[in-house]
Amino acid sequence: MRISFDIDDTLVCDASVPTEREISRWRRWRYPERLRRGTRSLMAALVRRRCKIWIYTSSDRSTHYLKSWFGSCGIQIEGVINRTVHERKVGLRGPSKYPPAFGIDLHVDDSPGVAMEGVDHRFEVLVVAPDDPDWAVRILDEVDARIRANPYWHARFAPRPAPGIEQFLPGLTQALRWMAVTP
């Protein structure tokens, strides 16, 4: 499942919204924007569910900047859609965001206007407000519901049990039993 996130007022909010813990001075100088608290753990939980994380922003932040910024926070970004990429693929007359053009299954944004465009152009948008303290839980609940509802995703993304050692070494169990009874 591909999930895209808006940046402004979704992952980066104003000073009244709690942010992730302090980062090094070098990173603060290079990446002055602070991620909303819970972003790292949310992204880690999505990766554990085998989701691909994308950034979809109407700003002109470069792909390199966004990938290196999130990478410095321990978050691997699969792809970036900025204004230039969006306009090249969707055009100037289309909606402000159009995730299906990039194979994205769910877009997370703070704007009700993007949600209305989603209804008009038939793409899925989850709106999270900057002041919502349970925003990450809402996103995970939505992703889990979508995974359960889609048999393909359910089979593909469901957690798999760790393989037993017997699968790797078929004769190991029998050899261990033989060694235990042999003096």
Question: Locations of the language-model features?
Answer:
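Short, basic/glycine-rich phosphate-binding loops at helix/coil junctions
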Residues: V12-W26
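C-terminal cap/substrate-recognition subdomain and adjoining C-terminal extension
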Residues: R49, R61-P183
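Asp-based phosphoryl-transfer active-site loop
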Residues: M1-S16
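Generic beta-sheet signal
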Residues: M1-I3, I53, D105
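Short hydrophobic segments within beta-strands
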Residues: D6, W54-Y56, V108
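Short, catalytically relevant binding-site loops at active-site mouths
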Residues: T10, T57-T63
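Short, acidic loop-to-helix structural element flanking the phosphoryl-transfer center
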Residues: S24-W54
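Residue-level marker of alpha-helix boundaries and capping positions
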Residues: E33, T57, D105-L106
